[in-house]
Amino acid sequence: MTKLSVNINKVATLRNARGGDTPNVVKVALDCEAFGADGITVHPRPDERHIRRADVYDLRPLLRTEFNIEGYPSPEFIDLVLKVKPHQVTLVPDDPSQITSNSGWDTKANLEFLSEVLDQFNSAGIRTSVFVAADPEMVEYAAKAGADRVELYTEPYATAYPKNPEAAVAPFVEAAKTARKLGIGLNAGHDLSLVNLNYFYKNIPWVDEVSIGHALISDALYLGLERTIQEYKNCLR
């Protein structure tokens, strides 16, 4: 079964826009779980413009589903993850100033660096995932670095999907087959939505997890959070 992890960064962005604690990030996360989410994802950035370090500590003891922390592996990020010990850590190659993740790792060029970082998390018993483009070579080098999983960066799929779904998903199928052949797990995320998720799933039904935030929270403005989560879960059947 493919798991749905809800990225709650946008909830934190809304809270931070006015100060105070509305909406309450922890309550929204717990409600997401109650409404059927299989996990919660956060991406704490150095400037704390959405998720704050304090949020990460507040969430960890209360969540009943999988907790996934994603981010660039700076010393501060590594320290946070090792202290909090989430179920999964996802490494992304973001510059701190980026609005959102917009590329995967060059796992070949960064093999030594990633290997050293992944070893720290693996030794702590934290499942590891590396954010990569739909390129079999990048998947192969992520496996060589010691990643338990890769997360496929799906923005190119989402962009190309409206014009030619078959062509859009083709490179992702090949990358997914490579991961399966190598025996590592497979996640996917970025710009997946109610429009394109089911087609992606039908072509790659062995994907372990999808992480969705912006589209899901946007849909919830119209449909409500509970119905929205159920709609996304329906896309994974």
Swiss-Prot record:
Range of residues in the leader sequence: none
Protein name per its UniProtKB record: Pyridoxine 5'-phosphate synthase
Domain of life the protein comes from: Bacteria
Database matches in InterPro entries: Aldolase_TIM, PyrdxlP_synth_PdxJ, Pyridoxine-5'_phos_synth
Family label: Belongs to the PNP synthase family.
Phylogenetic classification of the source organism: Bacteria, Pseudomonadati, Bacteroidota, Bacteroidia, Bacteroidales
Enzyme class: transferase
EC assignment: 2.6.99.2
Residues annotated to bind 1-deoxy-D-xylulose 5-phosphate: R45, H50, T100
Location(s) in or outside the cell: Cytoplasm
SUPFAM superfamilies: Pyridoxine 5'-phosphate synthase
GO BP annotations, alphabetical order: pyridoxine biosynthetic process
Keywords of this entry: Cytoplasm, Pyridoxine biosynthesis, Transferase
Site description Transition state stabilizer, residues in chain: E151
Involved pathway(s): Cofactor biosynthesis; pyridoxine 5'-phosphate biosynthesis; pyridoxine 5'-phosphate from D-erythrose 4-phosphate: step 5/5
Principal subcellular localisation of the protein: cytoplasm
